[in-house]
Amino acid sequence: MKKKSGLSFLWLSAVAFVIDLLTKYLVTQNFELYESVNILPVFNLTYARNTGAAFSFLAEHGGWQKYFFIALALIISAVLVYLLRKNSARQKLQNSAYALIIGGALANMADRAYHGFVVDFFDFYWREWHYPVFNVADIAICVGVGLLILDSFKNGEKKANEQ
Protein backbone atom coordinates (compact mmCIF):
# COMPACT_ATOMS: atom_id res chain seq x y z
CA MET A 1 0.00 0.00 0.00
CA LYS A 2 1.37 3.39 -1.03
CA LYS A 3 1.71 5.81 1.86
CA LYS A 4 0.18 9.27 1.62
CA SER A 5 2.57 12.10 0.70
CA GLY A 6 2.74 15.71 1.75
CA LEU A 7 0.93 16.63 -1.47
CA SER A 8 -2.28 16.06 0.48
CA PHE A 9 -1.57 19.44 2.13
CA LEU A 10 -1.94 21.39 -1.12
CA TRP A 11 -5.53 22.16 -0.12
CA LEU A 12 -3.97 24.65 2.30
CA SER A 13 -2.19 26.34 -0.62
CA ALA A 14 -5.51 26.64 -2.43
CA VAL A 15 -7.21 28.15 0.63
CA ALA A 16 -4.44 30.76 1.09
CA PHE A 17 -4.49 31.52 -2.66
CA VAL A 18 -8.27 32.00 -2.85
CA ILE A 19 -8.58 34.05 0.35
CA ASP A 20 -5.72 36.31 -0.74
CA LEU A 21 -7.10 36.96 -4.23
CA LEU A 22 -10.63 37.44 -2.89
CA THR A 23 -9.52 40.03 -0.32
CA LYS A 24 -7.43 41.84 -2.95
CA TYR A 25 -10.43 41.89 -5.29
CA LEU A 26 -12.65 43.33 -2.55
CA VAL A 27 -10.09 46.05 -1.81
CA THR A 28 -9.61 47.05 -5.46
CA GLN A 29 -13.39 47.16 -6.04
CA ASN A 30 -14.19 49.20 -2.94
CA PHE A 31 -11.20 51.51 -2.40
CA GLU A 32 -9.45 54.18 -4.42
CA LEU A 33 -5.68 53.86 -4.56
CA TYR A 34 -4.21 54.99 -1.19
CA GLU A 35 -7.68 55.31 0.32
CA SER A 36 -7.55 54.37 3.98
CA VAL A 37 -10.27 53.33 6.43
CA ASN A 38 -9.47 53.34 10.13
CA ILE A 39 -10.48 50.07 11.82
CA LEU A 40 -8.63 50.29 15.16
CA PRO A 41 -6.41 52.93 16.78
CA VAL A 42 -3.38 51.04 15.38
CA PHE A 43 -4.83 49.52 12.19
CA ASN A 44 -6.14 50.80 8.86
CA LEU A 45 -7.25 49.13 5.67
CA THR A 46 -5.27 51.03 3.04
CA TYR A 47 -5.17 50.22 -0.68
CA ALA A 48 -1.54 50.26 -1.81
CA ARG A 49 0.36 48.84 -4.77
CA ASN A 50 3.76 47.22 -4.46
CA THR A 51 5.92 46.62 -7.55
CA GLY A 52 8.72 45.19 -5.42
CA ALA A 53 8.94 42.40 -2.90
CA ALA A 54 8.46 42.49 0.87
CA PHE A 55 8.76 46.03 2.27
CA SER A 56 8.82 47.32 -1.36
CA PHE A 57 12.29 45.83 -1.90
CA LEU A 58 13.37 46.60 -5.51
CA ALA A 59 10.17 48.58 -6.17
CA GLU A 60 11.95 51.40 -8.00
CA HIS A 61 13.94 49.38 -10.55
CA GLY A 62 12.26 49.92 -13.92
CA GLY A 63 10.02 46.87 -14.27
CA TRP A 64 12.45 43.95 -14.67
CA GLN A 65 11.69 42.91 -11.09
CA LYS A 66 8.16 41.83 -12.13
CA TYR A 67 9.61 39.00 -14.20
CA PHE A 68 12.26 38.21 -11.61
CA PHE A 69 9.67 37.79 -8.83
CA ILE A 70 7.34 35.76 -11.07
CA ALA A 71 10.21 33.39 -11.92
CA LEU A 72 11.29 33.24 -8.28
CA ALA A 73 7.75 32.37 -7.11
CA LEU A 74 7.48 29.61 -9.73
CA ILE A 75 10.88 28.13 -8.86
CA ILE A 76 10.28 28.22 -5.10
CA SER A 77 6.79 26.73 -5.52
CA ALA A 78 8.11 23.94 -7.76
CA VAL A 79 10.84 23.06 -5.25
CA LEU A 80 8.33 23.04 -2.38
CA VAL A 81 5.87 20.86 -4.34
CA TYR A 82 8.75 18.44 -4.95
CA LEU A 83 9.54 18.42 -1.21
CA LEU A 84 5.85 17.86 -0.39
CA ARG A 85 5.84 14.90 -2.76
CA LYS A 86 8.84 13.39 -0.98
CA ASN A 87 7.45 14.04 2.51
CA SER A 88 5.18 11.70 4.40
CA ALA A 89 1.74 13.12 5.22
CA ARG A 90 2.68 12.60 8.88
CA GLN A 91 5.10 15.55 8.68
CA LYS A 92 2.23 17.92 9.39
CA LEU A 93 4.15 21.01 10.49
CA GLN A 94 6.61 20.98 7.60
CA ASN A 95 3.93 20.15 5.02
CA SER A 96 1.67 22.93 6.33
CA ALA A 97 4.59 25.35 6.13
CA TYR A 98 5.42 24.42 2.54
CA ALA A 99 1.76 24.62 1.51
CA LEU A 100 1.28 28.08 3.04
CA ILE A 101 4.42 29.39 1.36
CA ILE A 102 3.28 27.96 -2.00
CA GLY A 103 -0.19 29.50 -1.67
CA GLY A 104 1.19 32.90 -0.71
CA ALA A 105 3.91 32.91 -3.36
CA LEU A 106 1.51 31.90 -6.14
CA ALA A 107 -1.14 34.41 -5.05
CA ASN A 108 1.32 37.31 -5.09
CA MET A 109 2.73 35.97 -8.38
CA ALA A 110 -0.76 35.91 -9.94
CA ASP A 111 -1.36 39.47 -8.77
CA ARG A 112 1.99 40.59 -10.16
CA ALA A 113 1.43 38.80 -13.50
CA TYR A 114 -2.09 40.22 -13.93
CA HIS A 115 -1.62 43.77 -12.60
CA GLY A 116 2.14 44.31 -12.73
CA PHE A 117 2.09 44.93 -8.98
CA VAL A 118 0.87 43.32 -5.76
CA VAL A 119 -2.16 44.74 -3.95
CA ASP A 120 -1.48 45.37 -0.26
CA PHE A 121 -3.96 46.63 2.32
CA PHE A 122 -3.17 45.71 5.95
CA ASP A 123 -1.69 48.87 7.48
CA PHE A 124 -0.52 48.67 11.10
CA TYR A 125 0.93 51.77 12.71
CA TRP A 126 1.88 53.49 15.93
CA ARG A 127 1.49 57.25 16.01
CA GLU A 128 3.38 58.43 12.88
CA TRP A 129 5.24 55.17 12.26
CA HIS A 130 3.65 52.71 9.79
CA TYR A 131 4.71 49.11 9.31
CA PRO A 132 4.93 48.31 5.58
CA VAL A 133 1.47 47.56 4.17
CA PHE A 134 0.94 43.84 3.43
CA ASN A 135 -1.68 41.28 2.37
CA VAL A 136 -3.00 37.78 3.13
CA ALA A 137 -0.39 36.11 0.88
CA ASP A 138 2.38 37.80 2.88
CA ILE A 139 0.82 36.46 6.07
CA ALA A 140 0.68 32.94 4.60
CA ILE A 141 4.35 33.13 3.62
CA CYS A 142 5.44 34.47 7.03
CA VAL A 143 3.38 31.90 8.94
CA GLY A 144 4.87 29.19 6.69
CA VAL A 145 8.40 30.37 7.42
CA GLY A 146 7.58 30.53 11.14
CA LEU A 147 6.30 26.94 11.03
CA LEU A 148 9.52 25.85 9.30
CA ILE A 149 11.56 27.48 12.05
CA LEU A 150 9.40 25.83 14.72
CA ASP A 151 9.72 22.49 12.92
CA SER A 152 13.51 22.83 12.81
CA PHE A 153 13.60 23.37 16.58
CA LYS A 154 11.30 20.41 17.18
CA ASN A 155 13.37 18.18 14.91
CA GLY A 156 16.58 19.42 16.52
CA GLU A 157 15.19 18.52 19.94
CA LYS A 158 14.08 15.12 18.68
CA LYS A 159 17.54 14.36 17.23
CA ALA A 160 19.26 15.53 20.43
CA ASN A 161 17.01 13.26 22.52
CA GLU A 162 17.77 10.29 20.26
CA GLN A 163 21.53 10.62 20.83
From Swiss-Prot:
UniProt GO BP? proteolysis
Keyword tags: Aspartyl protease, Cell inner membrane, Cell membrane, Hydrolase, Membrane, Protease, Transmembrane, Transmembrane helix
Q: Where in the cell is it found?
A: Cell inner membrane
Where, by residue number, does the polypeptide cross the bilayer?
7-27, 64-84, 99-119, 133-153
Q: What EC numbers are recorded for this enzyme?
A: 3.4.23.36
- Membrane topology label: Multi-pass membrane protein
Top EC group: hydrolase
Tell me which residues this entry annotates as catalytic: D120, D138
Q: Which domain of life is it from?
A: Bacteria
Family that this chain belongs to: Belongs to the peptidase A8 family.
The UniProt entry, under HAMAP family, shows: LspA (MF_00161)
Function of the protein: This protein specifically catalyzes the removal of signal peptides from prolipoproteins.
Name this polypeptide is given: Lipoprotein signal peptidase
